[in-house]
Amino acid sequence: MSGSRVSDLSKLHLKKELTQIRKAGRVLRDPGTTSSWKSPLDSSRSVALLETPASRNGGSSSQFPIRGESSTNRRGKEKKVFLYNWKTQKSSSEKSGLAKNGKEEEEEEEDASSWTQASVNDDDDVSDARNGGDSYRREIQSASMGFRCRDTNLASQGVSKMRKSNVGSCKKKSKKKISSSRLDCLSKYQPRDDIVARNCNAGSDDTEEELSNSEDLRKVTGASPLLLKLKQKNWSRSSSRLLRANNRKEDSSCTYNSTPALSTSSYNMYAVRNPSTVGSWDGTTTSVNDGDDELDDNLDLPGRQGCGIPCYWTKKAMKHRGGCRSCCSPSFSDTLRRTGSSILCGSQSVYRRHNRHSSGGYSKQKIACRSAQGVLPLLSYGGDGRGGSSLGTGLSDDELSTNYGELDLEAQSRLDGRRWSTSYRSQDGLEAVALDGEEEEGSTPETIRSFSQKYRPMFFEELIGQSIVVQSLMNAVKRSRIAPVYLFQGPRGTGKTSTARIFSAALNCVATEEMKPCGYCKECNDFMSGKSKDFWELDGANKKGADKVRYLLKNLPTILPRNSSMYKVFVIDECHLLPSKTWLSFLKFLENPLQKVVFIFITTDLENVPRTIQSRCQKFLFDKLKDSDIVVRLKKIASDENLDVDLHALDLIAMNADGSLRDAETMLEQLSLLGKRITTALVNELVGVVSDEKLLELLELALSSDTAETVKRARELLDLGADPIVLMSQLASLIMDIIAGTYKVVDEKYSNAFFDGRNLTEADMEGLKHALKLLSEAEKQLRVSNDRSTWFTATLLQLGSMPSPGTTHTGSSRRQSSRATDDDPASVSREVMAYKQRIGGLHFSKSASPASVIKRNGNHSHEAKPFSRVIDNNCYKSSSSSQMIESEGSIASHENSIASTMMLNQRSSEKLNDIWRKCIERCHSKTLRQLLYTHGKLISISEVEGILVAYIAFGENDIKLRAERFLSSITNSIEMVLRRSVEVRIILLPETELLVVPHQTRKPEMTNKSGHLNNIAGLNAETDVEVGSSVESRSKLPMQRIESIIREQRLETAWLQTADKDTPGSIIRVKPERNQILPQEDTYRQTNVASAISSSGLTTHQWVDELNNEVKLLKIGDNGELQENLTGTRGQHCPLSPSLLHDTNFGNNKDNLGGYESGSGRVGCNILFCWNTKKTQRRSKSKQVKGTPVRSRRNRKSRFSLFNGCAKPRKAEGNIRR
């Protein structure tokens, strides 16, 4: 009765299976036409091996033949139903490995391992196996439960709830009992029954060896009608899409044939900790080893058939599913459970400790068998240690995997709780882990879409802009002088990585005569196709690349083959991002470099590369590419791609690429996608810059002081999205191009002299330089400012209000001279040189007289400009200038027919007087003011060859010579008024003519169209000589001017200090400041003399009388008379500058000075007025009155004799002071 029950139950169970399989056949799509994961053509393999469960209470082997007989008797009556592993297919060579199951389990038992072909245990099973126990009984029981679940629910079509209920029912049934019908159904597979029985009773070794042969297994497998039927319908090519369509319906579909270790770390942590265990992840079918008990195979099939493991299984559920639960380690199964996706649907090879000593002959046979079926390796390594297949080598795959061991990286990455293999979310990503130099999928020439990749240089001749680097590397290859380490540094897009690749190809090129790389040999073809095994390119920017670099350095001696003639080149990109530990490993390698190993470091930031590494490398600098080179390459690309491009647009692209060819190619590619003609406007819109035409218009408005239009145009550009910093940089670049004369004006509207650097005048050039200086200073403020738009607009407004070049020169001279009193004597030379550099262009003829200049300018009036236009364009542009010179009328009448002449006409006489009066007020010395107001007259101001020349006339030769000593002070006073660089020429005119020129109405014949001066009788040969002497050595004018100004002021200061000590309080109100050298504006306006001059209350005769009284003070007499004169007159009269007394011409010309005579008849001065005494020198040193070395540089002839008043005894000096 029990037997019939068993039979009825068996039929019922088989009927359910048939019903489920038929439902699956109606729902599932044809995998041959609808699968997206295509398997190889010869991958139609299956394994119909069934696991026989054993009772928990045990059983004898004699029971199995009896059940096998009862099952055999019903074979003819019942319809044969074979279960098919939908996810796993095996080749015949792999199936043969099942026959050796007993022998392998015995070896595993001796090693205290828990690994079987039916199940691969995780933590619990490993612990049981190590503890001894009844681990094998538990393994077989769990295997039977796993098979039972798969056997009953393989093609289940229920929803997830049905799947969960089926799983629960399977668990309950497996815990209660083992059905006899189950054993009856499995009795058809007699050899397998004996194998399972042997697992329960380990003592039946003979029966196990007799029944476990692979031939019987092949017969049973081939006799499966279900398998044959599925083969006819092309179901053998079921892909992972079939898995995705079924895994929602199935309860379990795990394979029991082989469960791989994910990595070295997973195998070591959960099994016997064999360091040589490496598994490759390629999404192929399971590997089942045969005769030699080898489970070591890292060459897996590329067909993504799937391992049959439901990725939704949890760790808890996997403990009750036998062999399937260990296919994924605990940490990896968590990831699979969380993601719910099929990350790994292929097989992984299990490598055992005892298999390391297996022979390589079987590996060759097994690989040859797979190669015959069209199976290509995904991750494989050649026998010489390079990448490639292990076919034809003497090394086993386990040894090769030990050498490379990519999955050792997983063990290192487990420190942060993540697995290296789980970072990939697809099978395509798993193919990128190869270290054999193969390119990733999608990088073949047919699939390349980027211009930078499509037109990447493949030979040295195709590299542009790096001639020095290319020549050096070519010579190194030609002469076989290869360094172990190279360092390529430079900005992005300059060809560093391309050069490294070409260099690696040239190292292994076998060409003898041609240029390397030749492109024809096998090595060059492998390199160009991306299949080179001697080139490894790693990225130091990500953690995976850094881990790979660390692994290579650690295992470099074992990776490299012995006696290899090929160079192994390792290119490490972004090496400056590598951690310090990796650099220490590199340092060990650099100290003891290996033969035929070359490292190439590529970096854009040399500062972050350790100095010790830099000193051991051959460094090559990759400069930015020239715009012309980039344009040539862009033209070639545009021609090859049939792009409609404007040549000016290519220039603009190259200019905005900043020396990077990659950026230029990317820009061109983006513009080509717009489907329009590539023009400059399109490039500007893409890059986000402002066109040169708009910049020129903005610059012209800013320089013309058009405030409203400047602000309006600046706002328009900013509203368009332009960056103020970029605008300012563009303006600065534009100004530099204009100054250099290299700017090419496209628009005719702007093709005037202002934008052509060759036609710029001195004033225009100074204005542009000043604008460039303002822009450069404002850019610094702009980068740290929060309101950049306001700063930019304010800077533009400053460009229009800039001072004229003359003001700049005068101000700079004044500032330089004002520091002279406190600086050392060497500062005078520095000031002179600086001043000379600023106005070095002002060079005049030595023998130019007023008459000759006027004549020349009159005859060639077209070469000169009227002074009125100069004044209007420069002096009166700003409000400050208009306050100094009244704006009523113009200085010269433009309607006048003689506007082209160089002399001012009658209408300008009042203006000349006004200018002369203002010049006198700005003189720093009272004596000079009196002298100029009394005897000097400004008769004309003219412009000669771009230089402003002022003619000042004196009626007496002695006064003229005296005024020439103050030439520098007079020049500075006039420059402050006119705000231009002026050359002052002092001439001698008869007194009668001198009085007529300013006070009487000019006669029409004084100036005519020819420009001659007809009615001035004093312009004779003598006048020419005098003028020639006054303008002698004009090339040294700046030097002489500054030195004379400093010397005059020091003399004046020293004389006033000496006079102040004798009569305190008498001249306090006219005492100048100590640090004052050159006149500042309104310095002496508050003095009594200045107020008297400005009020013009004194007549010429009165001024002459006061000057005569002052001269009387200089008469040398006894001390009492001198003291009395000083007491009575000093409070009312200004002191006379002692410069005349300490000059050689004073003694020679004393008879011609009109009252200047010495009482003692000696050439010299009274000691009271002399500053050149020893006591005064010491006092000036104590008070730090600088300038003594300047006096020491004076001609020794100008010093007084030791027997004069300057050398009187100290006692006499004390008496005088008392």
UniProtKB/Swiss-Prot annotation:
Instruction: Give start-end ranges for motif Bipartite nuclear localization signal.
Output: 163-180, 1178-1195, 1196-1213
Q: Which residues form a coiled coil?
A: 762-788
Q: Do you know what upregulates this one?
A: By gibberellin A3 (GA3).
Q: Which InterPro entries match?
A: DNA_pol3_clamp-load_cplx_C, DNA_pol_III_gamma-3, DNA_pol_III_sug/sutau_N, DNA_Rep/Repair_Clamp_Loader, DnaA_N-like_STI, HLD_clamp_pol_III_gamma_tau, P-loop_NTPase
Which Pfam families does the UniProt record give? DNA_pol3_delta2 (PF13177), DNA_pol3_gamma3 (PF12169), DnaA_N-like_STI (PF23007), DNAX_ATPase_lid (PF22608)
A single GO BP term for this record reads: trichome differentiation
Query: Residue spans with biased composition (Polar residues)?
Result: 32-46, 54-73, 86-95, 804-819
What keywords appear on the UniProt entry? ATP-binding, Coiled coil, Metal-binding, Nucleotide-binding, Nucleus, Repeat, Zinc
What is the annotated signal peptide range for this record? none
For the keyword Nucleotide-binding, the answer is yes
Query: MF terms per GO, please?
Result: ATP binding; DNA binding; DNA-directed DNA polymerase activity; metal ion binding
Sequence motif PEST 2, residues: 425-449
The entry's localization annotation reads: Nucleus
Q: In which tissues is it expressed?
A: Ubiquitous.
Q: How does it assemble?
A: Interacts with BLT.
Q: What is the purpose of this protein?
A: Acts as a key regulator of trichome branching through an endoreduplication-independent pathway.
Q: What is known of its domains?
A: PEST motif is known to mediate rapid protein degradation.
Family listed = Belongs to the DnaX/STICHEL family.
The name this protein carries in UniProt is Protein STICHEL
Name the lineage. Eukaryota, Viridiplantae, Streptophyta, Embryophyta, Tracheophyta
Q: Supply the gene name.
A: STI
